[in-house]
Swiss-Prot record:
Keywords: Dioxygenase, Iron, Metal-binding, Oxidoreductase, Phenylalanine catabolism, Repeat, Tyrosine catabolism. It comes from the Bacteria. This is 4-hydroxyphenylpyruvate dioxygenase. PROSITE patterns: VOC. The lineage of its organism: Bacteria, Pseudomonadati, Pseudomonadota, Gammaproteobacteria, Pseudomonadales. Its EC number is 1.13.11.27. The keyword Metal-binding applies. Homotetramer. Fe cation binds at H168, H246, E325.
Amino acid sequence: MNAVAKIEQHNPIGTDGFEFVEFTAPDAKGIEQLRQLFNMMGFTETAKHRSKEVFLFQQNDINIVLNGSPTGHVHEFALKHGPSACAMAFRVKNASQAAAYAESQGAKLVGSHANFGELNIPSLEGIGGSLLYLVDRYGDRSIYDVDFEFIEGRSANDNSVGLTYIDHLTHNVKRGQMDVWSGFYERIANFREIRYFDIEGKLTGLFSRAMTAPCGKIRIPINESADDTSQIEEFIREYHGEGIQHIALTTDDIYATVRKLRDNGVKFMSTPDTYYEKVDTRVAGHGEPLEQLRELNLLIDGAPGDDGILLQIFTDTVIGPIFFEIIQRKGNQGFGEGNFKALFESIEEDQIRRGVI
């Protein structure tokens, strides 16, 4: 069951969670590498678009679209950014009404690239020139039933490692743009700020503002650098612009999921050993097996008996500078604020080793 932030407010476009995230790469080799990555992460390639080089990967309630189109907006995006996250989609109650409202609030509608007989899904210009699709359920048929041919004998969980749904999706923006993008989501869909962090490492720092939709199912933290050399600025330089930094996917058993992912060849960011020396003090009474946390490099945060805890881990960068987060919530609806500094410092130490700062 989806854990959601408890938000009670006007929902002008009827948001109801993430529908999909779309990825691309500039050439066939890059597309094949993404296909292999999604297989390693437990997704099954269940369908192919009827007329385009577009493929659907699924696992429980997570939909990933892999777009290998050699022309058009997506290809231009890939040529600029390399392997990248070129779009995301919100589930909404009525897509056309949602698009009209968003446009009335200053969003820029992007022209459709649908062919005859295909769904014309409204899209807005999003972060870094990516697209933000607005998708409703079109009665009894999903968007995939209309535009995709499903592969016989395959189902979403054939290769599942236990990932269940998209928990949040984080943006990295240029300095001075955090207010711009938080304001964008506030205007078009009545998002509200639920967390704000100011993280300082040894040499660099960042600000982060977490925005949540009225439905409580769409959470978008927005990161902005405090200086020229932080990991946020490095991302923007490598990615050639702003964009989606990471995608957080939930699991009901992070220990089992991470073991399966490791067995499949997925690499994770390391955690300093000193982190685990402080866990029992920082999260007293957490009740988790400390040696397994250490073995798997899992991070823990929260307040047992109060708001609960969460467990999380981050992959290495796997799509250009983009990475994935695996998260299990045990009552806690935060973003691992207590881990931000530890994680920030570990990435910063890697930057120092590589001579970036």
